[in-house]
Each structure stands twice: as C-alpha cells, then as structure tokens.
Amino acid sequence: MNEFKQLSWQGLWKNNPALVQLLGLCPLLAVTATVTNGLGLGLATTLVLIGSNATVSIIRNLVPNEIRIPIFVMIIAAFVTVVQLLMNAYTYELYQALGIFIPLIVTNCAIIGRAEAYASKNPIGYAAFDGLMMGLGFTVVLVLLGAMRELLGYGTLFAGANLLLGDWATSLKVTIFTTDSPFLLAILPPGAFLGMGLLIAAKNILDKRFERMFAAKQEAKVVQRARVTAET
C-alpha cells in the first residue's frame, strides 16, 4: 500500500479523528443539529487542516524544536482567521449559526496533532494530503451525526443547505415527516452524545467483522498452501 492510500485509509477509517482518536468532540457535539451545520464546520476544519499541514511541512526545517508548538498554533490560528473571514463574507447566516465554534477550530487537537505528528516530519505533498483525508474523515462524521439528529429531531434532511451552498440548494431539502414540535432529545447535546456513541459502536462492529473475514481468508490460504504441498 503506497503512502497516499495509507493516508486515505488512516484518515477516513482506521485512525479517524472523531471515531477513533475522539478529538474535536466539543464542536462536533455542539453544532451538528443539522447536516448543513455539520458540513459547514467540517469543510472549514478541512481547509484549516490542509493549509496548516502544508505550511508546517514547508517550514519544518526552519523552526527550532523548542518553540515549534507555539509556532504551529500561530499558523493554525492564521488559517482559522482566513476561513472565518471568508465565511463571514460569503456564508454569513451559517457563520452566525456556527458562532464561537469557528474560531475554536484553533483548539481542535486533531489539527495540532497532525501538524506535530505528521506534517512536521514529511514533504508538503504528503502533509497536505494527510490534512485533506483527516479533514474529510472528520467531515463525514459531522455530516452523519447531523443527518441522524436532523432526521429524528425535525424530520428533514439538508434543511438550510442554501446557507452554505447558495439559493439553488434550497431545493435539496428533503422532508421525511412533519412535526409540530421537534424531538428535543435528538437536537440537544444529549442526543449528540447518544448518536456519537452509536456511530462509534457501528464502526467497532464493522472492524471486528472485517477482522474475522480477513482471518478466515488467511486461514483458507494456509490450508490451500498446505494441501498443495502435501500433494506434491
């Protein structure tokens, strides 16, 4: 498996920042009441990851080891500021909905963790791709959790997509059922904890199933090899 495939596998599944490392849970649990909010925060985090990883990789040989962490945090803060200003300019209503959790991207341990553990030790191409895959892995979890909570809480999917994608996205809204009052357990933080627990449990179940399938295939290969050897 080459490096790019390994980075994709690590970011999207095996070492997913939300489901495995359990990083960035504060914004993940707080703003994922809808798919749109989750997707908006996920894309913002992904842009910061790509930019900060690439920059850290470029200057990795110039930064004194003793002060590398403060410098990495300053780089991350700079990219968060850029993303914040862009959202303020082009997606203002979504910017207001996400509120304080956009600047709090600076404190996301997944970002500083990747800058320290990977970007500071690898070339820019690998570092940027690592940021992309980690960001996409985080975004997928945000979107799935947002979809679960929005569906159970409001009976809709992609409500408010126009806040992120423009007026044309208004037609993306899907109404599964109508309700006079939302299901509060789903749209409040307790529902986020329950939904996150279900996603983690589902991943663990799939991992164990894949391990059993792989073990069975390996055992079948060993038996086949032994049979061929015995026949010869």
Swiss-Prot record:
Its EC number is 7.-.-.-. GO terms for cellular component: plasma membrane. It is found in: Cell inner membrane. It is a multi-pass membrane protein. The chain crosses the membrane at residues 18-38, 39-59, 69-89, 93-113, 128-148, 182-202. It holds the Pfam family Rnf-Nqr. Its main location: membrane. It is an enzyme of class 7 (translocase). One of its GO terms (biological process) is electron transport chain. Keywords: Cell inner membrane, Cell membrane, Electron transport, Membrane, Translocase, Transmembrane, Transmembrane helix, Transport. The complex is composed of six subunits: RnfA, RnfB, RnfC, RnfD, RnfE and RnfG. Belongs to the NqrDE/RnfAE family. Part of a membrane-bound complex that couples electron transfer with translocation of ions across the membrane. This is Ion-translocating oxidoreductase complex subunit E. It comes from Pseudoalteromonas atlantica (strain T6c / ATCC BAA-1087).
